[in-house]
UniProtKB/Swiss-Prot annotation:
Amino acids binding Co(2+) 2: E66, D71
Cofactor, how bound (note): Uses a typical 2 metal-ion mechanism to dephosphorylate dATP.
Residues given in the record as Co(2+) 1 binding sites: H30, H62, D63, D111
Gene giving rise to this polypeptide: datZ
UniProt source species: Vibrio phage phiVC8
Name of the protein: dATP triphosphohydrolase
Matches recorded under InterPro entries: HD/PDEase_dom
Catalytic activity of the protein: dATP + H2O = 2'-deoxyadenosine + triphosphate + H(+); dADP + H2O = 2'-deoxyadenosine + diphosphate; dAMP + H2O = 2'-deoxyadenosine + phosphate
Length: 170
């Protein structure tokens, strides 16, 4: 289990270290945004009560490993996976490891929506544009994947469209 001091550091651990941005985003801000998107997706699908709360908590803690390890670029995570290492499991510090496949997909879609939106809004320069393009491609590839539940595809597309048009998700 992670110590409270490390959890509280999440607000000071930066993301997007390899991209120029108009401002710094912390791991805590990212996880909070992902939780709001996940909550919206749950409501869109009709998930509520304890199940929604569990998914929101999972979204609030999904990148807690990065408080210790720092933000890892996707390419690094891919290379670790190729080596048989799950990057989000490098530090077994969070009790809310996502085991339910549906919840895992929902949080991943919310994570990609948040990342694509944030780098679109705050990225500067050609590299940030490329990262935004890659992130959007990953998002839409996942949403169009036949293995992804159609309710998740619908909820993800709704959340993406609302965010792009500046609508509140709450």
């Amino acid at each position: 289990m992670m110590q409270i001091q490390n959890i509280l550091r999440a607000g000071h651990v930066p993301r997007w270290q390899l991209c120029d941005t108009t401002r710094t985003q912390s791991i805590a801000e990212h996880m909070f945004n992902v939780a709001l998107i996940a909550r919206h997706m749950c409501a869109h699908i009709g998930i509520n009560g304890d199940e929604m709360n569990e998914i929101v908590v999972q979204a609030l803690t999904h990148d807690m490993d990065e408080v210790i390890l720092g933000d890892m670029p996707t390419v690094t995570k891919q290379r670790l996976r190729e080596a048989g290492i799950e990057p989000n499991g490098l530090i077994d510090c969070v009790e809310t490891i996502i085991t339910d496949p549906f919840a895992k997909q929902l949080v991943k879609i919310a994570d990609l929506i948040e990342a694509a939106w944030w780098i679109d809004e705050h990225g500067i320069g050609r590299h940030a544009e490329r990262v935004a393009e890659i992130t959007r491609h990953r998002l839409f590839s996942m949403l169009n994947n036949a293995k992804v539940d159609k309710a998740l595809t619908s909820a993800g597309m709704d959340a993406w469209e609302r965010i792009k048009h500046g609508e509140l998700l709450i």
